[in-house]
């Protein structure tokens, strides 16, 4: 928890003042029963109206000052809690940005979203309540007991018996429910994960008429969550009736002892009223304390989940700077794989095995294979989204591990299978490639990506709004814009991971021709299911079940690689790929 507590350093003053003002408010509250006892014992008994008015004025003054202290405490506690959660959320988001794909895959997107949102909100609520009540409630409980001794020692012993019994109930419930809240939160993660998966793949679900099975899956997970929450709720609900039973029995005992003391002249009727008021104050504060414990238990469970993310160290280390001279040999290797293997964390079988090839600068490399053959796994090693578990990967003549993150990602641009655009404008999305790019550079990239025509057709051109995820654009438009975004950065290696799947054959061919015509020595990796898209590549890597079963040009592979021949034949058998 040390990492999380450091985010409270900027709010130490507020974190100290909030409980202090609450204690000050509680001090004024403790004097109220004594003033009321005086009104009954002196004012009412003597029919002294002036005395009653003066004491009522004192009660009003205590209420006003107490209210001022309470509002001040609320302000400081809210400022500390909101500021703390804001700082923690920023730190968590920044930490997540440093995590590698392996850590992201292990934890899951839905879990990270939950910890960024509801978990931190729960921590904020718990901290806010804690700062206001963690001193006030115990202070009132102990203070009321001490004040009871100033009224009548014999009656005050009832407080001494009641308070420990109440504490056992309150803390017993806390000990039982705290681990259960963690389990409930884990089940909530499961429900959120299923919801996200269903909404993301809603078209597939409906295409296969799987609505009923998805509903059943969701209901099963939701039922487990509901049962756990009900179980926790049932245990927590015992707190109020048990505490009320103890308090009411204590009040009955108090009235009984009070009646005896009044008969023998040991105390007045106003003193009994004061003692009952003190007992009621204890009841109110213990109910608050019980609620505080429940909220803090939830907050601690959520804080532990947030801390687990913060404790997760990135699996990849990037050097701060590139050591030695940058290689400028234009005839050298752009990418070299030497007996590379890759096994994902938690996977039983390797995704890639013994992959070796060399891509020269300026070459176009095709990657093809069946579903699950390891195409995306292979190209993910080039920008170092994952580290090879066997062998070495060299980029531009150096091991990938020697590059700083910015230098490597600046040299290697990746266009993913799923085109991802961000809310803003076409211009703001393109500037992700190079924030200092001029309009001429943006249009040049759009021309190469075959996107210039439809962007010009937009009323605002480059400043045309883009909705979150590019919802207002077609699949082909999104793919072309993501390719243009990659080209704006003028990388030395461009990876197109099946990123032209939504393009027609004519546009796909025009794109490949435009890429080949780019000046310089751009090395292009094209991952595609279409053999036609790779026919003119300098080399084609053929993968099957994580192994490289073919390497060469199109014509050679048709003669030497049965897997490639089968893929090609399946697409051209009916001639639909060329018509």
Pin down the residues of each PLM region.
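ABC-type nucleotide-binding domain
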Residues: 326-579
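Helix-loop-helix
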Residues: 47-54, 147-161, 231-305, 309-310
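An intracellular "coupling" helix at the cytosolic face of ABC transporter transmembrane type-1 domains
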Residues: 10-13, 98-102, 118-131, 135, ...
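Transmembrane helices of ABC transporter permease
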Residues: 10, 14-27, 38, 62, ...
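Pre-NBD coupling/linker segments of ABC/ABC-like ATPases
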Residues: 314-330
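Membrane-integrated ABC transporters
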Residues: 1-31, 36, 44-60, 65, ...
């Amino acid at each position: 928890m040390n990492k999380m507590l450091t985010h409270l350093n900027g709010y130490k003053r507020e974190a100290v003042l909030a409980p202090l003002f609450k204690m000050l408010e509680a001090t004024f509250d403790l004097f109220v029963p004594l003033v009321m006892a005086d009104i009954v014992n002196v004012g009412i008994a003597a029919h002294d109206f002036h005395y009653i008015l003066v004491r009522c004025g004192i009660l009003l003054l205590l209420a006003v000052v107490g209210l001022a202290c309470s509002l001040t405490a609320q302000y400081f506690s809210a400022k500390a809690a909101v500021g703390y959660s804001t700082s923690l959320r920023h730190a968590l988001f920044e930490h997540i940005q440093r995590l590698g794909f392996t850590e992201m895959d292990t934890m899951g997107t839905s879990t990270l979203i939950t910890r960024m949102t509801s978990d931190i909100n729960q921590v904020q609520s718990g901290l806010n309540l804690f700062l206001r009540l963690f001193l006030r409630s115990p202070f009132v409980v102990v203070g009321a007991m001490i004040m009871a001794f100033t009224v009548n020692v014999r009656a005050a012993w009832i407080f001494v018996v009641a308070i420990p019994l109440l504490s056992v109930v309150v803390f017993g419930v806390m000990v039982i429910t705290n681990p259960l809240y963690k389990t409930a939160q884990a089940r909530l993660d499961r429900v959120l994960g299923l919801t996200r998966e269903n909404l993301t793949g809603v078209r597939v679900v409906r295409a296969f008429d799987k609505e009923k099975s998805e509903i059943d899956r969701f209901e099963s997970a939701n039922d487990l969550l509901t049962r756990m929450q009900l179980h926790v709720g049932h245990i927590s609900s015992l707190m109020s009736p048990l505490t009320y039973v103890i308090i009411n029995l204590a009040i009955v005992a108090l009235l009984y002892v009070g009646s005896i003391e009044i008969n023998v002249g040991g105390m007045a009727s106003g003193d009994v009223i004061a003692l009952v008021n003190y007992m009621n104050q204890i009841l109110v504060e213990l109910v608050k304390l019980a609620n505080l414990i429940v909220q803090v238990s939830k907050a601690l469970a959520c804080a532990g989940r947030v801390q687990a993310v913060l404790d997760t160290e990135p699996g990849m280390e990037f050097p701060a700077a590139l050591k030695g001279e940058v290689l400028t040999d234009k005839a050298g290797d752009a990418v070299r794989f030497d007996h590379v293997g890759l096994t994902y964390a938690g996977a039983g079988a390797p995704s890639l095995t013994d992959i070796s090839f060399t891509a020269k600068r300026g070459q176009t490399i095709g990657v093809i294979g069946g579903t699950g053959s390891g195409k995306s796994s292979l190209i993910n090693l080039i920008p170092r989204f994952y580290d090879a578990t066997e062998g070495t990967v060299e980029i531009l003549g150096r091991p990938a591990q020697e590059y700083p993150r910015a230098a490597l990602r600046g040299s290697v641009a990746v266009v993913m299978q799923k085109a991802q655009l961000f809310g803003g404008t076409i211009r703001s999305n393109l500037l992700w490639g190079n924030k200092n790019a001029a309009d001429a550079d943006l249009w040049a990239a759009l021309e190469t990506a075959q996107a210039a025509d439809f962007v010009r057709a937009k009323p605002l051109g480059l400043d045309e709004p883009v909705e979150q995820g590019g919802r207002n654009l077609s699949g082909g438009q999104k793919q072309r814009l993501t390719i243009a975004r990659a080209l704006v950065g003028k990388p030395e290696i461009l990876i197109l991971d099946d990123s032209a799947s939504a393009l027609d054959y004519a546009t796909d061919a025009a794109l490949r021709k435009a890429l080949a015509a780019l000046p310089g020595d751009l090395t292009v990796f094209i991952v595609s299911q279409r053999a036609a898209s790779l026919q003119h590549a300098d080399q084609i890597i053929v993968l099957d079940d994580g192994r490289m079963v073919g390497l060469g040009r199109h014509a050679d592979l048709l003669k030497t690689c049965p897997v490639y021949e089968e893929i090609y034949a399946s697409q051209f058998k009916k001639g639909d790929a060329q018509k």
